[in-house]
Amino acid sequence: MTEPGGLLNVIDVEATCWEGQPPPGAVSEIIEIGLTVVDLGTGERVEKHRLLVAPARSAVSPFCTELTGLTQEDAAAGVGFTEACRILAARHRAGERPWASWGDYDRHQFTRQCRATGTTYPFGHRHTNAKAVFTDAHGLRKRPGMAQALRVAGLPLEGRHHRGEDDAWNIAALILGLVERGAWPDLSAPRRQPPPPGSPRRVV
C-alpha cells in the first residue's frame, strides 16, 4: 500500500561506540533514532522525530558522548529497542513507507540488533542508499560523508552533526536536492524481490 503524497521516512541512528575496542561483553547498540518524513510530492520536509533508545548490553562512553552529545543518562531514559521498533511500525508506518538512510550502516545495524534481540524488523523492502544515489548524481569518485555532501550541494548543516534527529533532517535536504535533479529513484511501487537461485526465469 502506498500513501497519498509519496511520503518517505529518512532514518539516521546513533549507537554506542568507543575509541578503540569495546569493553568485554559490550556490543554496539542503537541509542538514538532520528526520523524525518519527506513529502516527495510537495518537495518538503514535513515531520521531524527523535527516539531515544536505552542500551541493554553496553553503556554510553565518554567518546560517544563527545561525538553525539548523548550521555548514559539520556540513553537510559529512552525506550527499549523492541518498543522503539514497535513505535516505528505503528506511528511512522515503517513497514509500509519507503525509507532511506545515508549509506547502509543504519539498515545493517537494525538487522543485526533485531536478530540479536528477537525483534521483528520494522521496515519494508523499499530502502534507498541516499549516499550511493548522491555519489552517482554528482559524478563523484568516492562516496562522501553527509557533511561533505552538504558542502558539495551548497546546503547548510542544520543542527549538530552526529545527532540522529539533525542528521536525518539534513539527509532529507540532500534527498530533496536529488529529487529536483530527477535523480531520486521512483519508490511509488514495491520493488520486486529477485527470484530464489535456480528458479526458472521468464523470457520476454
Question: Which residues are covered by each model-predicted region?
Answer:
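Conserved non-catalytic scaffold segment of RNase H-like nuclease domains
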Residues: M1-R115, Y121-G124, A147, R151-H162
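Acidic two-metal-ion nuclease catalytic site recognized across multiple nuclease folds
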Residues: T2-E3, V152, A172-V204
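Active-site flanking residues adjacent to catalytic metal/cofactor-binding acidic residues
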Residues: I11, T128, D166
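Non-catalytic, well-ordered alpha-helical scaffold segments
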Residues: H108, T128-K131, W169-A172
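Short alpha-helix plus adjacent loop in nuclease-associated cores
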Residues: T128-R143
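Short, charged, surface-exposed loops that flank catalytic or proteolytic processing sites
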Residues: E158, H162-G164, A183-S188
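A charged, well-structured terminal subsegment
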Residues: R160-G177
